[in-house]
Amino acid sequence: MALVSETGVDVSTDGITVVLGSQWGDEGKGKLVDILCDNVDICARCAGGNNAGHTIVANGQTYDFHILPSGLVNPKSVNLIGSGVVVYLPAFFHELENLVKKGLDCTNRIFISDRAQLVFDYHQRADALNEAELGGKSIGTTGKGIGPAYSTKATRSGIRVHHLYNWPEFESRYRKNVRDLQKRYGAFEYDVEGELVRYKELAAKLQPYVVDSIAFIHTGLKEKKRILVEGANALMLDLDFGTYPYVTSSNTTIGGVCTGLGVPPRAIANVIGVVKAYTTRVGAGPFPTEQLNEIGDHLQKVGREFGVTTGRKRRCGWLDLVVLKYSTLINGYDSLNLTKLDILDDFKEIKVAVAYIVDGKRIETFPADLDSLESAEIIYETFPGWQTKTTGITRWEDMPENAKKYIEFIEKFLGVPIKYIGVGPGRDEVLVKH
């Protein structure tokens, strides 16, 4: 085992490498993507919107990413926002301008699919009204309008990037969507005329960034470009396989890569799952291993568990291997990146969930019926902690024995090798375990 910075990490030229979140998000995908992007020609987003968020520290600068692919930090990579993404144009340009102010040259390095759906202010208004209607049973969305944007997509009333360049069609769709929302919510005041003027200006500003993403990505594959896909959110937030209805509105699994970029499954060469060494979640929804005690408080404080997008405190608990086994079955990980191992350094003992007892029966796969989890008993394996710093360790041989046992148990339980191990917040504090 050695530091990533010493060994280098290569990305295949024989197909797409995908980085996916394996839990409820915030696993640390951005840092791995940043490292991998040192050797990438194309970095792409395939789903979600600016509800995702992560921070990258490079070249003495801190960069916050929400809608843009983090491959922009590497001056050699070209970046693509795919067809499965929903894009709020003011946020797109705001984020881009912030990167340029910090010295990143983004010229001819960021492109957006002409098939991507657009998010508008009326989607954000609808998002807030939906949450208010749900009251105590609200989902805990980011309020960015992502769900309503995917809703209009599903009902075929959505507006795509290419509609900006067929203005009569754009205007007709825009006016109808606002009228429909006014019928739905009643008091829904909205400056349609002002927004249409704004979007005419944004259309002209956006035009140099718009591409046929299908031709773009398949040309890259044909030319043996090194392509990395940066997953947003995570498996347990997937619309179909997550903790429904406490999920996001897109497909955040490996299937979403194919549908969001327009590539066949055989084009994917390598799938890396990112796993936090414990578990966190933002917003409402089931969380079987949540620790509403000093353990959760310690993880939250030491792990600096605040959302990049919302600033909300993350809920914290022990690692859940039932969730991760389920995640592995669906996404088919070739390897894992275990992050934030150092946050566990001070614990005298560490627990890992290996099964649930539901209605008197032991289950080892995550159930669809979330109500059954409310009374579930969690079966844990308990490990002695290592109670020594892992930050600064550069070789597997120097890793505390109890930390090795923890890592090896996870590998054996899931049947997937842990290739990357994070032992600190810095870009160079990631070890490659061969």
Curated annotation (Swiss-Prot):
Disulfide bonds: none annotated. One of its GO terms (cellular component) is cytoplasm. GTP binds at residues 25-31, 53-55, 314, 340-342, 422-424. Pathway: Purine metabolism; AMP biosynthesis via de novo pathway; AMP from IMP: step 1/2. It is found in: Cytoplasm. It catalyses: IMP + L-aspartate + GTP = N(6)-(1,2-dicarboxyethyl)-AMP + GDP + phosphate + 2 H(+). SMART domains: Adenylsucc_synt. PROSITE patterns: ADENYLOSUCCIN_SYN_1, ADENYLOSUCCIN_SYN_2. Pfam families: Adenylsucc_synt (PF00709). The active site is at D26 (proton acceptor), H54 (proton donor). Mg(2+) binds at D26, G53. Its main location: cytoplasm. GO terms for molecular function: adenylosuccinate synthase activity; AMP binding; GMP binding; GTP binding; magnesium ion binding. The keyword Lipid metabolism does not apply. Keywords: Cytoplasm, GTP-binding, Ligase, Magnesium, Metal-binding, Nucleotide-binding, Purine biosynthesis. IMP binds at D26, E27, G28, K29, N51, A52, G53, H54, T142, R156, N233, T248, R312. Its cofactor is Mg(2+). Substrate binds at V308, T309, T310, G311, R312, K313, R314. Plays an important role in the de novo pathway and in the salvage pathway of purine nucleotide biosynthesis. Catalyzes the first committed step in the biosynthesis of AMP from IMP. NCBIfam families: PRK01117.1, purA. Belongs to the adenylosuccinate synthetase family. This is Adenylosuccinate synthetase.
